[in-house]
UniProtKB/Swiss-Prot annotation:
Source organism of this protein record: Nitratidesulfovibrio vulgaris (strain ATCC 29579 / DSM 644 / CCUG 34227 / NCIMB 8303 / VKM B-1760 / Hildenborough) (Desulfovibrio vulgaris)
InterPro entries assigned to the protein according to its UniProt record, in alphabetical order: LS (IPR034964), LS/RS (IPR002180), LS/RS_sf (IPR036467)
Broadest EC class assigned to this enzyme: transferase
Family: Belongs to the DMRL synthase family.
Pfam families with a match to the protein in the record: DMRL_synthase (PF00885)
A GO-annotated cellular component: riboflavin synthase complex
Protein name: 6,7-dimethyl-8-ribityllumazine synthase
PANTHER family: 6,7-DIMETHYL-8-RIBITYLLUMAZINE SYNTHASE, 6,7-DIMETHYL-8-RIBITYLLUMAZINE SYNTHASE DMRL SYNTHASE LUMAZINE SYNTHASE
Gene name of the record: ribH
EC number: 2.5.1.78
Catalytic activity of the protein: (2S)-2-hydroxy-3-oxobutyl phosphate + 5-amino-6-(D-ribitylamino)uracil = 6,7-dimethyl-8-(1-D-ribityl)lumazine + phosphate + 2 H2O + H(+)
GO molecular function: 6,7-dimethyl-8-ribityllumazine synthase activity
Protein task: Catalyzes the formation of 6,7-dimethyl-8-ribityllumazine by condensation of 5-amino-6-(D-ribitylamino)uracil with 3,4-dihydroxy-2-butanone 4-phosphate. This is the penultimate step in the biosynthesis of riboflavin.
Protein residues bound to 5-amino-6-(D-ribitylamino)uracil: 25, 59-61, 83-85, 116
GO biological process: riboflavin biosynthetic process
Length: 156
């Protein structure tokens, strides 16, 4: 069988610096996501002093702040955490779509990996499930994704 070179990221956060952009809106959910992300990174070797949490009003503001952090050169990875919960108006669609597109654009323009932990749910119950209940903690999953991506990017 032919040998195929495979590049994989090691889940070792030692020496890396991360910024977490977290919304204040729906903070009872977002605080759980932050806890999951910080716990994951620390369990994988990241020192507390290498974590910075930036609190912002809501999801619509995330792309601008993530872009500024990514371009600062201070961080190896950015983690975006928030919760947009559907209501009775189309506001949910506008906010979640623009935040998602903007975060992707910030990541691509800067070349700095970004972990996407912006929950977009139909109701509060779904958000709770994704913030450490039945469906795991999406904050921890976003941290895992950004850590692995940082380590892959180092090898490219």
């Amino acid at each position: 069988m032919l040998h195929i070179k495979t590049i994989e990221g090691q889940l070792d956060a030692k020496g890396l610096k991360f910024a977490i952009v977290a919304t204040r809106f729906n903070d009872f959910i977002v605080d759980r996501l932050i806890g999951g992300a910080c716990d994951y990174l620390q369990r994988h070797g990241c020192d507390r002093e290498n974590l910075t949490i930036v609190r912002i009003p809501g999801a619509f503001e995330m792309p601008l702040v993530a872009k500024k952090l990514a371009h600062s050169g201070k961080y190896d990875g950015i983690i975006a955490l928030g919760a947009v919960i559907r209501g009775a108006t189309p506001h949910f669609d506008f906010v979640s779509n623009e935040a998602s597109k903007g975060l992707a654009q910030a990541c691509l323009e800067s070349g700095v990996p970004l972990g996407f932990g912006l929950l977009t749910t139909d109701n509060i119950e779904q958000a709770i499930e994704r913030a450490g209940s039945k469906a795991g903690n999406k904050g921890a999953e976003a941290a895992a994704a950004v850590l692995e991506t940082v380590r892959v990017m180092e090898q490219l």
